[in-house]
């Protein structure tokens, strides 16, 4: 279990660091605002939320990104598309975040993409693999995992062998 948590910490640190790099070129504010919309209905989901919150708190305590503190806003989308769209809208227009991270469900991420693109807020997608996410073609959308089309090919080959 410890090895899995270490890997999760690394992944979330990389995601938050990537968000910082994207933001640094976009925002010269004193505080970097990061908005997150994840499915947090299970122990694993809650752990993801705690992990990213703890990572940001640690960075704010020990150091910053280019001297800028990080302000984290975390919402639970419950893997429901209407909540994801509401979260993305709130993050972009009300909370005025510099970057959105999420969602962890492709069915939620797909309808969030047009919201981020229209608001011109970069969106980093750490989990969703649906190929249509990046097919929508926005310069503001960055998907971390490989497309599900690739996984299907690999799984098919593995099954055949």
Please provide the spans of the model-predicted regions.
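Extracytoplasmic ligand/sensor domains, especially the bilobed periplasmic-binding protein
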Residues: 82, 96-161
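Extracytoplasmic "Venus flytrap"
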Residues: 35-53, 75-82, 104-105
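Signal peptide-proximal N-terminal region
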Residues: 50-72
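Bacterial N-terminal signal peptides
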Residues: 13-24
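Short, Lys/Arg-enriched N-terminal segments with co-localized hydrophobic residues
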Residues: 1-4, 25
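Immediate post-signal peptide segment of exported/extracytoplasmic ligand-binding proteins
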Residues: 26-37, 64-71, 160-161
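Structural motif
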Residues: 69-94, 149-154
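Bacterial N-terminal signal peptides that target proteins for export
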Residues: 3-15
């Amino acid at each position: 279990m410890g090895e899995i948590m270490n890997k999760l910490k690394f992944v979330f640190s990389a995601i938050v660091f990537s968000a910082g790099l994207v933001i640094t070129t976009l925002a010269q504010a004193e505080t970097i605002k990061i908005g997150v919309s994840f499915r947090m209905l299970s122990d694993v989901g809650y752990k993801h939320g705690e992990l990213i919150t703890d990572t940001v708190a640690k960075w704010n305590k020990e150091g910053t990104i280019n001297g800028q503190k990080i302000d984290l806003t975390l919402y639970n989308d419950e893997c429901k598309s209407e909540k994801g769209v509401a979260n993305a809208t709130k993050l972009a227009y009300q909370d005025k975040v510099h970057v959105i991270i999420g969602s962890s469900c492709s069915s939620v991420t797909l309808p969030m993409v047009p919201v981020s693109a229209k608001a011109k807020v970069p969106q980093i997608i750490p989990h969703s693999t649906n190929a249509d996410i990046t097919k929508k073609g926005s310069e503001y959308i960055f998907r971390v995992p490989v497309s599900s089309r690739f996984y299907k090919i690999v799984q098919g080959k593995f099954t055949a062998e």
